[in-house]
């Protein structure tokens, strides 16, 4: 058992070292550090003096009866502007409308009842993809709302920035995206971000923290599954409900890990289970709609 635990721990450490910043799981852990997040946003905004007040990662917005949203990185600066960083590795349909839904969800959560619409904060969405979303050979697509005839700008305070990791225009943003792809812990070119990555990948404290983050992730999935199973147990019998809850917790955990861009090998190493994980993983991958919660 002792040898198995050591081997499992080494496998997890190896998986952590293989992660890069195009994994929203790893990006969330890296950028919950305020200095690292500030470094990234200063480059994305071309604003070297930008000051971040607070950062929240995996920020959940839930509304009864509607599609829930989990935001990868949500930050606020000293002038109360809001920034959201989203990572997408799957080249599937609906990205632009997904951004539309994200912005509306953020607006709903930040505008209190009775407040005027002018109190909506300035919002910048950075939608980072591992493919060129417009196939126009640009690193960045900055979107503005304009009148079709005279190109008059209608600024509603929402700024959409579509950025990809594949087109290298030799700009500072492209250099940052190259680092996102490679995320070599020996690359020191990106200051506090490089330091954060090295800490998480190489130090004992960093890898322990990553393991804690993974365990927290598993617990959230377990709690969600048990909650649903126990609710069903009200009508189907408590024992059966708890059994269903345990099964749902595993499904929920695997699904959350898949959404966070973890592959089968990474998930099975963390859960220490190949056979059942493989069955559930294949069902999730081939499901027609995998985005019940973002």
Predicted feature locations:
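Accessory alpha/beta interaction modules
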Residues: 1-158, 169-171, 294
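Short, charged alpha-helical interaction segments and adjacent helix-coil junctions
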Residues: 2-17, 21, 25, 44, ...
């Amino acid at each position: 058992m002792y040898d198995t635990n050591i081997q499992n721990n080494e496998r997890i450490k190896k998986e952590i070292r293989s992660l890069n910043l195009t994994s929203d799981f790893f990006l969330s852990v890296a950028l919950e550090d305020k200095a690292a997040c500030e470094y990234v946003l200063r480059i994305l905004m071309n604003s070297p003096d930008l000051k971040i007040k607070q950062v929240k990662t995996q920020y959940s917005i839930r509304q009864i009866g509607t599609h829930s949203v989990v935001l990868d990185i949500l930050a606020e600066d000293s002038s109360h502007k809001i920034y959201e960083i989203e990572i997408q590795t799957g080249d599937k349909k609906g990205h632009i409308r997904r951004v539309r839904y994200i912005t509306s969800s953020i607006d709903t959560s930040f505008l209190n009842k009775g407040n005027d619409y002018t109190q909506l904060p300035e919002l910048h969405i950075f939608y980072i993809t591992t493919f060129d979303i417009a196939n126009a050979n640009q690193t960045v697509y900055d979107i503005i709302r304009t009148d079709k005839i005279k190109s008059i700008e209608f600024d509603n305070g929402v700024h959409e920035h579509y950025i990809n990791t594949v087109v290298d225009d030799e700009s500072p943003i492209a250099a940052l995206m190259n680092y996102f792809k490679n995320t070599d812990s020996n690359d020191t070119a990106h200051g506090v971000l490089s330091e954060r990555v090295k800490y998480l990948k190489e130090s004992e404290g960093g890898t322990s923290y990553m393991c804690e983050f993974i365990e927290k992730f598993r617990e959230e999935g377990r709690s969600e599954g048990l909650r649903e199973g126990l609710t069903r147990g009200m009508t189907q019998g408590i024992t059966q409900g708890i059994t269903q809850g345990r099964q749902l917790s595993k499904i929920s955990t695997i699904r959350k890990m898949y959404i966070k861009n973890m592959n089968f090998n990474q998930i099975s190493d963390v859960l220490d289970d190949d056979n059942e994980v493989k069955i559930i993983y294949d069902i999730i991958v081939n499901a027609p709609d995998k985005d019940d919660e973002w």
